[in-house]
Design a protein with these regions (language model features):
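Bacterial N-terminal signal peptides that target proteins for export
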Residues: 1-11
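C-terminal tail/sorting-segment detector
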Residues: 6, 336-352
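Bacterial N-terminal signal peptides
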Residues: 9-20
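Structural signature of tandem-repeat unit edges
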Residues: 31-41, 59-67, 87-122, 133-146, ...
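Terminal processing/anchoring signals of secreted or surface-associated proteins
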Residues: 61, 288, 306-310, 326, ...
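Consensus positions within tandem repeat domains that build extended binding/scaffold surfaces
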Residues: 125-128, 148-153, 171-176, 194-199, ...
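Residue-level detector of functionally pivotal "anchor" positions at catalytic/ligand-binding pockets or at interdomain
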Residues: 301-325
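Short, surface-exposed loop/turn motifs with a glycine/proline- and acidic-biased composition
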Residues: 323-343
Length: 352
């Protein structure tokens, strides 16, 4: 009798613990708040792993393995959009795809404008997360090379985004209207930014354009009114019409291209022509004054050669930092900084 009672108490205690854990993992609406990890042995099997009754309960998901169009249908459904881009009851807010790989195959994941969209190897497809209003945080696959058109358009509460180092292109309208984004790093291998890619990302306060970037599309950063400083590096060959239209918060633009890129029209309309100062390479004032940059009243030459945006030395340590006027700086300061290192080197660093 005593053994039976002891076993009964033990079982009761175990059920109480399990019940407590279940309560901690779900909120009052039955939503699962802890991260759910799904490892796929084969692409196209996510519908089998996450049944239809559970898809609108998961808020935090990590997927490991290969995913194709069939899987992407489920991801979109969980993130609030079905195949026809109509709303669902999905509540997915946090998605980690760092150990996933997007592959070709499976069903089409979206039908829009009389067109079906399919996955392709290492590409985040067109309309992948279009109007997924609840998505707040996303880590993309490490092997991703491109982001398709309007992939995140309308994801206005997206605040955290990790872009992989191998990303080379961002498509048209990719982040259109993502006003919740405040800052993120564009990878060094990125070469092109499409038309209207960041249109209306008014929450962006800082943005570092990589050295490898060669083209910025038309209206790419239109109405990014939160941006205060911008650096256009020497590798740029073309900037489209209205690329920075309506960026009313800009106070400084640093241009490092001694050979002027091909410039579109109305690039800076809506910016503050008096408040914003443009810094151009020494000896190029006339060229820039005769170009679209003449929109601004203040164009100043500076020594732009030998600029280093990223310091990669593992051994050298920073000893001191100065402004271009020779003033000692206690911390990295927006604009051009001159930095002395312990190995004796001196480098010019663009700080945005």
């Amino acid at each position: 009798m005593r053994n039976f009672t002891f076993k009964g108490l033990l079982l009761a205690a175990m059920f109480m613990v399990l019940g407590s854990l279940a309560i901690q993992a779900a909120d009052d609406d039955g939503l699962i708040t802890k991260q759910i990890t799904v490892k796929l042995e084969k692409a196209g099997t996510l519908p089998d792993r996450i049944g239809s009754t559970k898809r609108d309960k998961i808020t935090n998901l990590k997927i490991i393995g290969e995913i194709n169009g069939t899987d992407w249908r489920v991801i979109r459904e969980m993130a609030g959009r079905d195949y026809y881009n109509d709303g669902t009851d999905g509540k997915l807010a946090i998605l980690d795809l760092s150990e996933a790989k997007i592959v070709s195959g499976g069903e089409s994941y979206c039908y829009e404008f009389h067109q079906e969209f399919y996955t392709h190897d290492n590409e985040l497809g067109t309309h992948a997360f279009l109007n997924c209003y609840g998505l707040t945080s996303l880590t993309l696959p490490a092997g991703l090379t491109s982001i398709g058109s309007f992939a995140f358009a309308g994801c206005y509460v997206l605040t955290s985004l990790s872009l992989p180092s191998g990303l080379t292109s961002i498509g048209d309208g990719a982040f259109y209207g993502c006003s919740g984004l405040t800052s993120f790093s564009l990878p060094s291998g990125l070469t092109s930014i499409g038309d209207q890619a960041f249109y209306g990302c008014s929450g962006l306060t800082s943005l570092s354009l990589p050295f490898g970037l060669t083209s910025i599309g038309s209206q790419a950063f239109r109405d990014c009114s939160g941006l205060t400083s911008l650096s256009l590096l020497s590798g740029l060959t073309s900037i489209g019409d209205g690329a920075f239209y309506g960026c009313s918060g800009l106070t400084s633009i640093y241009v490092y291209a001694e050979k002027m890129p091909k410039l579109g029209t109305n690039m800076f309309d809506g910016c503050d022509a008096k408040k914003c100062t443009v810094y151009v390479p020494k000896g190029t004032y006339d060229d820039y004054w005769l170009s679209e940059f003449s929109y601004f009243e203040n164009i100043v030459e500076f020594e732009a050669t030998g600029i280093n945006n990223v310091i990669t030395s593992n051994d050298a340590k920073e000893l001191s930092r100065y402004s271009v006027n020779g003033q000692r700086l206690s911390a990295p300061t927006q604009g051009l900084n001159i930095v002395k290192y312990s190995d004796g080197s001196v480098k010019k660093v663009a700080v945005q």
